[in-house]
Amino acid sequence: MNFSTPTLVINKSISLNNLDRMIDVANKNNLVLRPHFKTHQSIEIGNWFKEKGVTSITVSSISMADFFSSEWDDITIAFPLNILEIVTLNLMIKQN
């Protein structure tokens, strides 16, 4: 494979098996799985989680929350708020 730009290459069956294992561990421990959507940043992969019953996610920035906000209602931003981004955050909340 030759790629000229950064490209996400993923084995779907391995990823879905890993997701099933994470869900199983959470269920066995009476926990809610709230995965951190950091590396894949993909609506399609996010939908794999939804199809398995995941309803909440964590991201690392307001821009990532904005990216996923059209598909997800329960998003936690796992980093302190930068006060300079408050206008962006308020706009995102109003749009969704």
Language model: regions and residue ranges:
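A generic structural signal for short
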Residues: 10-11, 33-34, 53
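N-terminal glycine-rich anion-binding loops that anchor highly charged ligand groups
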Residues: 14-44
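Generic detector of leucine side chains in alpha-helical contexts
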Residues: 8, 16-19, 31-33, 81-84, ...
